[in-house]
A protein has these predicted regions:
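Anionic-ligand binding patches
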Residues: 1-135
Length: 135
């Protein structure tokens, strides 16, 4: 068996980490700071086999947010409740409306699981998913 672990962090261009906010006020503050800026999402991936790290890596995704108004930010946070999301938004939900541009080789990195890297790692470990396996 292989244990798969993944997590994500978001950074501004100036290197400030936008942690999972935990509160609406912090989410509003982060989105206000990130408005009209490029953000980089880093998604880590670790595979454990027989109690040892068998594979690890980090993939990135660059996201440019639109220029957001204060009411738009408040409304978004109240509706989508992104309190446990790096960067304070859910790109797979209503947060997609906040985005102007995305640059990545794997969109799944933005969602927190670098799926293409995971599939490559499983192939390298001779444990690939079959087409009958759900992803």
């Amino acid at each position: 068996a292989i244990i798969i672990g993944a997590d994500q962090v978001c950074c501004t261009q100036s290197g400030i980490v936008l942690h999972k906010p935990g509160s609406a006020d912090r989410a509003i503050g982060q989105l206000t700071q990130a408005s009209d800026q490029w953000l980089t999402f880093y998604s880590s991936l670790v595979l454990i086999r027989n109690g040892a790290v068998a594979w690890s890596g980090v993939e990135s995704c660059a996201v440019k947010l639109r220029r957001l108004t204060n009411p738009e930010i408040r409304d978004y946070v109240m509706v989508d409740n992104p309190l446990w999301s790096a960067g304070s938004f859910h790109a797979e939900g209503a947060g997609l409306r906040l985005i102007e541009k995305i640059e990545t080789t794997d969109i799944n990195v933005l969602y927190g699981l670098p799926a293409l890297a995971l599939l490559q790692a499983l192939r390298e470990l001779n444990d690939p998913l079959t087409y009958a396996s759900p992803i």
